[in-house]
Amino acid sequence: MNQMLPEQLLNQLNLVEKALAALRNGQGVLVADDPGRENEADLIFPAESVTIPQMALLIRECSGIVCLCMTDGKIRSLELPMMVENNTSGFQTAFTVSIEAAEGVTTGVSAADRVKTVRTAVSENARPSDLRHPGHIFPLRARPGGVLERPGHTEATVDLMRLAGLSPAGVLCELTNPDGSMAGIEETFAFSVQHGFPVLSIGDIVAYRKSLLQTGSQGLSA
């Protein structure tokens, strides 16, 4: 690390590096949103390696709406239409139609079935016919510019996977409290300590990417 960098930036870069190391090891990370935006934390795992126990954790401890963040190119290759033609969502979250694996699942609801659907969708050789609609996994289309274009969890997920050298796809779900309310920052850190997940913010990822651009480093690939 450059010792001349401001302390705050160094801290942000270190947080991202810890998260990338965890993702490379197939572990999860918690990404917090800006307090002035959605003000929530999402639990994120690499799509290429997500396990049944990890999926069960997402279903049990989070909102249950498990999303699969993918690039625009991947969404197009799977011929997934957007959920609505006119997106009136306040944050322009780009949902496509929901999906289910065409083979190898039963009702599609179980953790094992959802992992099968994710693995099917992100396979390099995946075809549109490999998926059925509707289903219990909700794909999200990331903007090409990542968090520098849209500072959302969808873009943060794809950016993190690329920065980690993984396939640019990840699963996420919003962290909730036992009473069903959204987890705040204190609950997020408590959950992090309990499960050993690194915590970082979308702002940290923005700072990391801007630092790469300033130094000319190649952190993202198509």
From Swiss-Prot:
Binds 2 divalent metal cations per subunit. Magnesium or manganese. One of its GO terms (molecular function) is magnesium ion binding. Mg(2+) 2 binds at residues 38, 153. Mg(2+) 1 binds at residue 38. Its EC number is 4.1.99.12. D-ribulose 5-phosphate binds at residues 37-38, 42, 150-154, 174. It catalyses: D-ribulose 5-phosphate = (2S)-2-hydroxy-3-oxobutyl phosphate + formate + H(+). NCBIfam families: ribB. This is 3,4-dihydroxy-2-butanone 4-phosphate synthase. The lineage of its organism: Bacteria, Pseudomonadati, Chlorobiota, Chlorobiia, Chlorobiales.
